[in-house]
Amino acid sequence: MKFTEHEMVFFNSITKGNDVFGIPLKFRTQKSHEEEVKKTINGLIEKGVLASETELTKMGFLPARALECYKESRNHVIINYLHIALLEQREAIVIIPLKNREYEMLRLPRVAVLYLLLKIYPVLQTGTVSEKELLQLQDIDSFLREVKDCKENIMIGEFQ
């Protein structure tokens, strides 16, 4: 689901923790602060995330919980603006910054994320596919265990 930066700030404010790893969320006001808050709340009501100014819907719980899981994750990977948090339950939260300070948030199986990354960025695949390499490519669980056991955050991509 797509959210504006102000809507992401709202979700950040109602979940545990402070910062969202790798994403500098800030409530930037163009008009008065009060007008921006009302505009954000009305946008969330239109999307079905809020029932009223103080009541979160079941549909609103899912993105709030996804952001909370992203913040609680110990393992994050950033690949060319894709912000990925690896969760314990073989899932991943992917936050994609879009144009006009909007974000798309997805909850996917980790294997699906890895498959999509290899498909989108063929540079991550190296060499020819021999039988030995094919066996390594098929053993995704081993790769995921290595990433999970990694104590540090991983960043892959070109940075300027």
Which residue stretches match the model-derived regions?
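Disordered, low-complexity tails and leader-like regions
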Residues: P24-H33, K39-G43, R110-L118, P122-T126, ...
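Generic detector of well-ordered alpha-helical segments enriched in charged/polar residues
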Residues: N12, K38-I41, A64, E68, ...
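Generic structural signal for short, solvent-exposed loop/turn connectors between secondary structure elements
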Residues: M1, R28-K38, A51-L56, H76-I84, ...
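Long, low-complexity, charge-rich intrinsically disordered regions
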Residues: L117-Q160
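Accessory beta->alpha helical hairpin/"wing" motif in late/C-terminal subdomains of nucleic-acid enzymes
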Residues: A51-L118
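A short-motif feature that recognizes glycine-rich, charge-decorated loops
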Residues: T29, K47, K58-F61, I156-F159
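Short, amphipathic alpha-helical interface elements at domain boundaries
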Residues: M1-I45, A51-S52
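Ser/Thr-centered flexible coil motifs
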Residues: K2-H6, F11, T57-G60, Q136-R145
